[in-house]
Amino acid sequence: MKAVSPVRPQSRKAQVPSVCGELALHCLSEHSLGVARYKMEEEETLCLQYDMNDCYSRLKRLVPTIPPNKKVSKVEILQHVIDYILDLQLALDTHPVLLRQQPPTRTPLTDLNTDPAALVVNKQGDSILCR
């Protein structure tokens, strides 16, 4: 009669489940990375949406021609902003005191875009970018 060992030797078939387990873990971690990437993109999109909504709210507060208690669409806000800018430009162009003065020299935009000193933020409100 042969003696049987209570501990079975590891056979090749016994190793397969651990390899499958590692593969499943790897697939799970790849899936988790994909989900995490998707969540990050979703959060970035949500942040951008909040930034845009904040910019529209600021425009709505700044332009006096927009009724404060009336719900207006984003397109209406932009139309009011354009009209307000045109009105301000017309007021500047036709102001009698300004007509008599020598127009100030204006720095070309190309100089502003290339000058690193122009990139300095002066006020806290200037640091908020409406993308």
UniProtKB/Swiss-Prot annotation:
Cellular component terms (Gene Ontology) = cytoplasm; nucleus
Under the heading InterPro entries, the entry gives: bHLH_dom (IPR011598), DNA-bd_prot-inh (IPR026052), HLH_DNA-bd_sf (IPR036638)
| Gene Ontology MF annotations | bHLH transcription factor binding; protein dimerization activity; transcription corepressor activity
Pfam families, sorted: HLH (PF00010)
Cite the record's tissue specificity text. Answer: During embryonic development, expressed in a number of neural tissues, including Rohon-Beard neurons, olfactory placode, eye primordia, and the trigeminal ganglia. Also expressed in other organs including the pronephros and liver primordium. Pronephric development begins by stage 25 and increases during tailbud stages. Expressed in both the tubules and the duct. As embryogenesis progresses, expressed in the migrating melanocytes and lateral line structures.
List all disulphide bridges recorded for this chain: none
Give every bHLH domain span: 36-88
The entry's function note states: Transcriptional regulator (lacking a basic DNA binding domain) which negatively regulates the basic helix-loop-helix (bHLH) transcription factors by forming heterodimers and inhibiting their DNA binding and transcriptional activity. Inhibits the activity of both neurogenic (neurog1/neurogenin, neurod1/neuroD) and myogenic (myod1/myoD) bHLH factors.
Q: What is this protein called?
A: DNA-binding protein inhibitor ID-4
Q: Which gene encodes it?
A: id4
